[in-house]
Swiss-Prot record:
One of its GO terms (biological process) is melanin biosynthetic process. The gene is tyr1. Binds 2 copper ions per subunit. The lineage of its organism: Eukaryota, Fungi, Dikarya, Basidiomycota, Agaricomycotina. It catalyses: 2 L-dopa + O2 = 2 L-dopaquinone + 2 H2O; L-tyrosine + O2 = L-dopaquinone + H2O. The keyword Zinc-finger does not apply. This is Tyrosinase. It comes from Pholiota nameko.
């Protein structure tokens, strides 16, 4: 039997577009919806290219996909049953060919559908099909997806005869046909995927209002996490996965941020559990953005790629704690009939048939120019999350001018992409994107240059008069203590008594999440040992500067405030309250400066403030010095 060989879309190199822009393009959206309908209706147990079998690569039903098995028999008592690599240095790169597989199969359906159009502009539909790529959901800029993803059970598209038609929306959920016998409760009783379900009963439904509220409340936390990761994490170990990092930063890993999106979207539903998350159609919008952030981070850190590590809990192929590196096969994704993709072969997305709008118009052969241009865009997109600290610390500016300050950040001089970035071809190969997507959102506008203001830096690594202290809470716990997904929520100010109000409280600052397989009987040894420790960070500075009413961000002002006002709670995915014995919440202050010509704020040595949480349940275990 021949393998499914993953090459990406051949012929052209085209942009993957942000979902808010994508849905505005009638041809793209109409073709995408129809293709997803076809994928979702393919008999799941009979075709490795069906939506169900592609989703099943990630987790359940823990069976071989495309006949790919390991050298040793899979042992459900010692290793994770899906192929996906979580808690591993391979996390970012394993998901790249996974999204590529999905895109490749989807694109074949898109082309077949475009060929059926009988309209006078059929050639335009065929061209749109050639240019269509999997869209991404940039939750760091827009945490609440458009209605076409989370609200509308039906959508209006243009059919093959050119007429508008209302159809069932395959982005809203996936309907199992049938529910797989491997699914545990409550998934075994739900005929469709659910997001933030209103109960665990068989008649549960999506709670769209709660989903929106949770994502909206998490926006600032997600944005600041993303900016900090892109600008302050410079080693692959700290960037790639949610296990305890290299100890040098106060920033979350890509995987940790990704975990939070899963838990926020899913709650007690499918996206909140790695065993069944990939069956929710939003999964690939989410992971396409994870892939985009991998591209942005790699551009800002040229030459840094996969470093050696281990497989943590293992996979369907890899035993637990097996050594992995840049050459480890990314199973089950074949690049030929006899070999698999490895991390070293997927650094250049243009060779895989796609790019992202941020890279349009750039000379990809000039790493330093690309670094400067991408840094420029990252500042525009997400920089306000950190530059509010400068605003709060600079009386001449004031905390109310965060947006204008972010626009005045000094940038390294480099050619910026053109204003219509989403329409420009990447270098070296052209990407032909329809004019309908040219008036594209913040991602294109982010490339605009701006004047450079004067900034003064003091000696000794302390903040200058135009610098500030950046305040961060570090959260550490054992990943498997509960055996299911959960969140540690941080508040500045009183915590509501009703847990239903926690995530929408005005005092909620942010959270760190555990994205945990809850399927009993699989990876039982990992779950029973419960000794995998993960860490995450919640950035406090923006909230303090905008809500605390303090005169500065210096330690003598902020430390007593945090001692009195910082609180935390543990919330399980099913909405129940938890007591996490392994929890340790501690606080760091990091002096930040913005030297003239620097691309990003420059952190000094972080300083522990153990006294803020020491002596409290779940607080710092370190003695106050």
């Amino acid at each position: 039997m021949s393998r499914v060989v993953i090459t990406g879309v051949s012929g052209t190199i085209a942009n993957r577009l942000e979902i808010n822009d994508f849905v505005k393009n009638d041809k793209f959206f109409s073709l995408y919806i129809q293709a997803l309908q076809v994928m979702s209706s393919v008999p799941p147990q009979e075709n490795v290219r069906s939506f169900f079998q592609i989703g099943g690569i990630h987790g359940l039903p823990y069976t071989p996909w495309d006949g790919i098995t390991g050298d040793q028999p899979f042992d459900p008592n010692t290793q994770w049953g899906g192929y996906c690599t979580h808690g591993s240095v391979l996390f970012p790169t394993w998901h790249r060919p996974y999204v590529l597989l999905y895109e490749q199969i989807l694109h074949k359906h898109v082309q077949d559908i475009a060929a059926t159009y009988t309209t006078s502009d059929k050639a335009a539909w065929v061209q749109a099909a050639a240019n269509l790529r999997q869209p991404y959901w940039d939750w760091a800029a827009n945490a609440v997806p458009p209605d076409q993803v989370i609200v509308s059970k039906k959508v209006t598209i243009t059919g093959s005869n050119g007429h508008k038609v209302e159809v069932d929306n395959p982005l809203y959920h996936y309907k199992f046909h049938p529910i797989d016998s491997s699914f545990p409760r409550p998934y075994s009783e739900w005929p469709t995927t659910l997001r933030q379900p209103n109960s665990s009963r068989p008649n549960a439904t999506d709670n769209v209002a709660k989903l929106r509220n949770v994502l909206r409340a998490s926006q600032e936390n997600i944005t600041s996490n993303t900016y900090s990761m892109l600008t302050r994490v410079h080693t692959w170990k700290a960037f790639s996965n949610h296990t305890v990092g290299d100890g040098g930063s106060t920033s979350n890993s890509l995987e940790a941020i990704h975990d939070g999106i899963h838990v926020d979207v899913g709650g007690g539903g499918h996206m909140g559990d790695p065993a069944v998350a990939a069956f929710d159609p939003i999964f690939f919008l989410h992971h396409c953005n994870v892939d985009r952030l991998l591209s942005l981070w790699a551009a800002i850190n040229p030459g840094v790629w996969v470093s050696p590590g281990d497989s943590e809990d293992g996979t369907f192929i890899l035993p637990p704690e097996a050594p992995v590196d840049v050459s480890t096969p990314l199973t089950p994704f074949s690049n030929t009939e006899t070999t698999f993709w490895a991390s070293g072969g997927i650094t250049d997305t243009t060779k895989l048939g796609y790019t992202y709008p941020e890279f349009n118009g750039l000379d990809l052969g000039n790493a330093q120019a690309v670094k400067a241009a991408i840094g420029n865009i990252v500042n525009r997109l997400y920089g306000a999350s950190v530059f509010s600290g400068f605003a709060a610390a600079t009386s001449a500016i004031g905390a109310g001018s965060v947006a204008s300050l972010a626009a005045d950040v000094p940038l390294e001089k480099a050619p910026a992409p053109a204003p219509e970035a989403a329409a420009q071809p990447p270098v070296p190969a052209p990407a032909h994107v329809e004019p309908a997507v040219r008036a594209v959102s913040v991602h294109a506008a982010a490339a605009q240059p701006h004047a450079e203001p004067p900034v003064h830096v003091s000696a000794g690594g302390h903040p200058s008069p135009h610098g500030f202290y950046d305040w961060t809470a570090r959260i550490e716990f054992k990943k498997y203590e509960f055996g299911s997904s959960f969140s540690v929520l941080l508040f500045l100010g009183p915590v509501p008594e009703d847990p239903e109000q926690w995530l929408v409280s005005p005092n909620f600052v942010g959270a760190h999440h555990a994205f945990v397989n809850s399927a009993a009987g699989h990876c039982a040894n990992c779950r029973s040992q419960g000794n995998v420790v993960v860490e995450g960070f919640v950035h406090l500075t923006k909230y303090i500067s905008e809500h605390a009413g303090l005169r500065s961000l210096n330690p003598e002002v902020v430390e007593p405030y945090l001692t009195n006002e910082l609180h935390w709670r543990v919330l399980k995915a099913d909405g129940s309250v938890g007591q996490l014995e392994s929890l340790e919440v501690s606080v760091y202050g990091t002096p930040m400066n913005l030297p003239v010509g620097a691309m990003f704020p420059v952190p000094g040595n972080r300083r522990h403030f153990h006294g803020i949480t020491h002596g409290r349940v779940g607080g710092s275990r370190h003695a106050i010095v």
